[in-house]
Amino acid sequence: MGASGLVWTLTIVLIAGLMLVDYVLHVRKTHVPTLRQAVIQSATFVGIAILFGIAVVVFGGSELAVEYFACYLTDEALSVDNLFVFLVIISSFGVPRLAQQKVLLFGIAFALVTRTGFIFVGAALIENFNSAFYLFGLVLLVMAGNLARPTGLESRDAETLKRSVIIRLADRFLRTSQDYNGDRLFTVSNNKRMMTPLLLVMIAVGGTDILFAFDSIPALFGLTQNVYLVFAATAFSLLGLRQLYFLIDGLLDRLVYLSYGLAVILGFIGVKLMLEALHDNKIPFINGGKPVPTVEVSTTQSLTVIIIVLLITTAASFWSARGRAQNAMARARRYATAYLDLHYETESAERDKIFTALLAAERQINTLPTKYRMQPGQDDDLMTLLCRAHAARDAHM
């Protein structure tokens, strides 16, 4: 497994301790973290991940350290894409701002448990089946294709997520109330003990993360077959996810090309896995069951490609006119959906805050070059959504 039982035990204790400290100091007391707090906490967890990488250099050598940092950076990038979906889920269910930290921490804990299971299943497949790399490579190429398709990006909207099988089953079989009760999971309604919608949100977040594991775990095994490093990179990237959510909440919509960058990364790793599978080929109908000479891609080269793609993706998202247009429309869609999903009991201050953000997004759309603005016959769904939000505002006033 690449590490002794003692090292595994110490690492698990460290991760569990960090999660416990995070809960006690930052989540147990209901509050919305300030930007300064989010920056400090995010920097702390990134620093811990880097210190762990330095420890890998000292005790394992530079080659293992490169593998760890490649896995950590890849999983961190994929996690940012996860955050976008978490943001859609939280907004579509109208989760109170004060309760969002608990939802995120639950999602992280659930993800850590499920992904650990996926890691060991993946390791078992690699060890016992010669064709496992072909399977992993194919999965990554399919995932890359889905991310690269515009329809794949649009499918991650609020209504699609709320219609998911997991949510429909939970909503059918669990007795839930219509309203939130702070950050509590249970409440009393009509003298009956019921679950609050917060539980449905946690189920949605946890269920969604299971789907994300299908691309993240094969991607990490494409960079290293060291199970311990895959686990450590996954754990440390997840630990900083809650703080990262509040830090880049307002920036997520700006990363409009992130999914395309991730598609390139997943496609690259998928091809790398296919090449490695061909190099060690034992499948009878491929080259008569003999290894196929292929180009070898080192982990250092993989890390370089990952860094370059992420830098280009980020720069293009922030500087291109098309990126600014997609950002404005994504923000308008998100705030309009959030406003329409508000309960009548929602405080006026929260309602006004969301509608003000919607107006700001609409103003940004109006300042765009004409060719990037919404035109008749295009983005009709968004225009309809905005009209509904304004009608709801007028009715509430």
UniProtKB/Swiss-Prot annotation:
It is a multi-pass membrane protein. The keyword Transmembrane helix applies. Belongs to the TerC family. The keyword Repeat does not apply. The chain crosses the membrane at residues 1-21, 39-59, 76-96, 103-123, 124-144, 194-214, 219-239, 255-275, 301-321. Keywords: Cell membrane, Membrane, Transmembrane, Transmembrane helix. The lineage of its organism: Bacteria, Bacillati, Actinomycetota, Actinomycetes, Mycobacteriales. It is found in: Cell membrane. This is Uncharacterized membrane protein Mb2742. It comes from Mycobacterium bovis (strain ATCC BAA-935 / AF2122/97). One of its GO terms (cellular component) is plasma membrane. Pfam families: TerC.
